[in-house]
Regions:
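Short beta-strand elements
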Residues: 18-24, 280, 384-387
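Conserved alpha-helical scaffold flanking the Walker A/P-loop in AAA+ ATPase domains
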Residues: 205, 262, 267, 277-300, ...
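Conserved inter-motif catalytic segment of the P-loop NTP-binding fold
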Residues: 242-276, 283-284, 390, 430-439, ...
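Walker B catalytic acidic pair
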Residues: 297, 303-304, 315
């Protein structure tokens, strides 16, 4: 008896269709799975035997051959378990209802329970593209799958429910389409908590308004980490398309829960400085997303930047330019997106007090140079804003004046982003930091005074072409905040001052 059931597979972020074909014939009793299955897929044989027993169904005493087509694509994980289970029932004629237009994804346990799997969102998105009408998923994945409209999602708790549904004894009801609630921002982390540091706050407002990378450097206790951790409170909300992109990455990484089936707030990732290269950029035998991809459409904060391994930091150079990470393995090449804001924070030396106005640095000059050399010139060049965070004065700490809240700063950020959205309509660009070189002159016009100042800055500072581009983009953002269509002299002057730290610390 031959039967075929639809399932889906996953390679990186990309889902692909899988046809589970079964042939039950006379011969020596055996149960084989072919079609490039990995070890987990092969182990499904024992899980399915036990699940059938839990449903009081005897496994056929016959030759059972399962083929996972296409046969030239590697199948990994427990995703096709439910489909294999249904194929066996169909092959045994235990169910008569047609399975055309249905797809099954989910792991089956020994007692017949259907267990949660990773990567449901991209697979359901593909099912909709393929015209599949109904997708049966584990109950714990149902909300995540129901984010996608245009396809009926059935939440399955156990194998018995499946059998009763397809025998017509007790029909499952499709899940309601899940509409994610509006993101509620965490007001416990507010810029109003940060005393003083008006210059650093202004710089981070510019970074948020244009999606720019920023490097914070200053002595211990000056508020670098405190400022960076409050950045999400002033970032604009995710669009639905951005939320889907971000959720896909978190879905395949197993970071979603039934309570949070879709990412509605911009990610904030802050890995420890002992992280490996694979942990930061992604990797493994089956390549998984790293921190740069998990921060996609959000913010990656690297605290104690100079404590990271230099080779690990250098891996960031290409992803920051290309906005994607490509990992090559024998089984294929996987690309993960990583459109991120990178915020780095570091001390200027091992003791932390180099350049401090009141405390003496105890580090020898060669130690300071060695510490700073962990941040290479090309990586430093990729930070649009270099922000010096000065020690907080007593007057600021003891002041009774209320600091500006994140909500007020966010209004200006949102206004600047609205200007950019209108400017970039139809271009695929979402913020000033993503302006491509071919569009730079067109989208960042300067008046004569600004152009003269830019030339002087370029010659005097010996800027690279990349640094020039980034100053121009930051100038564009400052002009947007200022409500100016043309970049003026004061906008260039303000942007240029954020490129001074490399001269102060690295090029003395």
């Amino acid at each position: 008896m031959f039967a075929k059931v639809s399932s889906l597979g996953l390679f990186g972020l990309n889902a692909f269709p899988v046809d589970v074909e079964i042939d039950i014939s006379r011969g020596n009793p055996q149960f084989e799975v072919v079609g490039l299955p990995d070890t987990v897929v092969k182990e499904s044989r024992e899980r399915i035997r036990a699940a059938l027993r839990s449903c009081s169904i005897s496994f056929p005493v016959a030759s059972v051959m399962i083929n996972l087509a296409p046969a030239d694509t590697k199948k990994s994980g427990s995703v096709p378990d439910m489909a294999i289970f249904m194929a066996i029932l169909r092959g045994m004629r235990m169910i008569s209802e047609e399975l055309e237009g249905c797809s099954f994804i989910g792991e089956i346990s020994l007692n017949g329970d259907i267990r949660r799997i990773n990567g449901v969102l991209p697979m359901v998105m593909l099912a909709r593209e393929l015209g599949i009408k109904s997708v049966f998923v584990p109950a714990d994945n149902a909300k995540e799958a129901s984010v996608i409209d245009g396809v009926d999602i059935y939440a399955v708790h156990n194998a018995e429910e499946l059998i009763r549904h397809f025998r017509g004894e007790e029909k499952l009801i499709p899940c309601e389409h899940y509409t994610p609630p509006e993101a509620a921002y965490n007001e416990t982390l507010d810029f109003a908590d940060v005393r003083g540091q008006q210059s650093a706050k202004k710089a981070l407002e510019i970074a948020a308004a244009g999606g720019h990378n920023a490097l914070l450097i200053g002595s211990p206790g000056s508020g670098k980490s405190m400022l960076a951790k409050r950045m999400p409170s002033i970032l604009p909300p995710l669009t639905f398309e951005e939320a889907l992109e971000t959720t896909k990455i978190h879905s395949i990484s197993g970071l979603l829960t039934p309570e949070t089936p879709i990412i509605t707030k911009r990610p904030f990732r802050s890995p420890h400085h002992t992280i490996s290269s694979a942990g930061l950029a992604g990797g493994g035998s089956i390549p998984h997303p790293g921190e740069v991809s998990l921060a996609h459409n959000g913010l990656l904060f690297l605290d104690e930047l100079a404590e990271f391994d230099r080779k690990t930091l250098e891996i960031l150079r290409q992803p920051l330019e290309d906005r994607k990470v490509t990992i090559a393995r024998a089984s294929g090449t996987i690309t993960y997106p990583c459109t991120i804001m990178l915020i780095g924070a570091m001390n200027p030396c091992p003791c932390g007090y180099y350049g401090h106005p009141k405390r003496k640095c105890i580090c020898p000059r060669n130690k300071v140079a060695g510490y700073l050399s962990k941040i290479s010139g090309p990586l430093l060049d990729r930070f649009d804003l270099h922000i010096e965070v000065a020690p907080v004065e007593f007057g600021d700490l003891s002041s009774k004046v209320k600091e500006e809240s994140s909500a007020d700063i966010r209004k200006r950020v949102m206004a600047a982003r609205a200007v950019q959205e209108e400017r970039f309509k139809g271009t695929g660009i979402t913020c000033n930091a993503l302006i491509t070189p071919d569009k730079l002159q067109e989208l960042c016009p300067m008046d004569d005074a600004a152009e003269t100042l830019m030339k002087n800055v370029f010659d005097r500072l010996g800027l690279s072409a990349r640094a020039y581009d980034r100053i121009l983009k930051v100038s564009r953002t400052i002009a947007d905040i200022d409500g100016s269509e043309v970049i003026k002299k004061q906008h260039v002057a303000e942007a240029a001052q954020f490129r001074s730290l490399d001269r102060k610390y690295w090029n003395e």
